[in-house]
């Protein structure tokens, strides 16, 4: 373990299927194979145990190589991947899960998500049926969705009679997803945030930097802590080992209510990723 690194493993959050998931982990979107292997290896050495990938990222095999090389027992790891829109459908989504397992070199993943609802395609409910089948066959421990609106989540529950364990969505102070978080909570669905650092757009924000100064923390740590204190699970992206150490070191302080409120006040609905209502998916 690197000097000064936090102790292994973030706290865990309970899912609605009796499984648990670390509240904080690292994603590998946009990373090349080499970058992925280095980042995942560094994250695991530092103590991170949740790694988030997707078929659409094209780097599942690189994640698998880093996992295998780590020597960490499989039971201590939490691996998430996602089905691409091209594989929406009952049979196709189940088969896509098996293909992801082959690329990852794993017998199962801990969480399998529908990457995008792609409502214009109209197959996300069928795709979730395939995820239910994959879970039943032991290909994945938990199943969930990503980028789903309240309407999409409700449709899945109403039509399959199964509630997703997780809804992973873009969530940061500029887009705090208050209504969606409440809706997820009503369904006992964990909200998991991605793009929590708003692509660096808040690194120099006066509100954030001022609060960071009061706690002796970095703006990044404050943004991650804010997200966690909302009750969310969080996925950050980084290929820098030093940044990964800093990002994981957010459990030894707590933001006061006035500072939470100040950061909440930055919400203006700015979406930095695609709109789930119109995006055709990946």
Curated annotation (Swiss-Prot):
Protein name per its UniProtKB record: Aldo-keto reductase MUL_1987
UniProt keyword annotations, A-Z: NADP, Oxidoreductase
Keyword Endoplasmic reticulum appears in the UniProt entry: no
Pfam short name (any one): Aldo_ket_red
Family that this chain belongs to: Belongs to the aldo/keto reductase family.
Active site (UniProt): 57 (proton donor)
GO function terms (MF aspect): aldo-keto reductase (NADPH) activity
Annotated organism of origin: Mycobacterium ulcerans (strain Agy99)
Annotated InterPro entries: AKR (IPR020471), Aldo/ket_reductase_CS (IPR018170), NADP_OxRdtase_dom (IPR023210), NADP_OxRdtase_dom_sf (IPR036812)
PANTHER family attached to this UniProt entry: 2,5-DIKETO-D-GLUCONIC ACID REDUCTASE (PTHR43827), NADP-DEPENDENT OXIDOREDUCTASE DOMAIN-CONTAINING PROTEIN (PTHR43827:SF3)
Binding site for NADPH: 197, 235, 238, 246-247, 273
EC number: 1.1.1.-
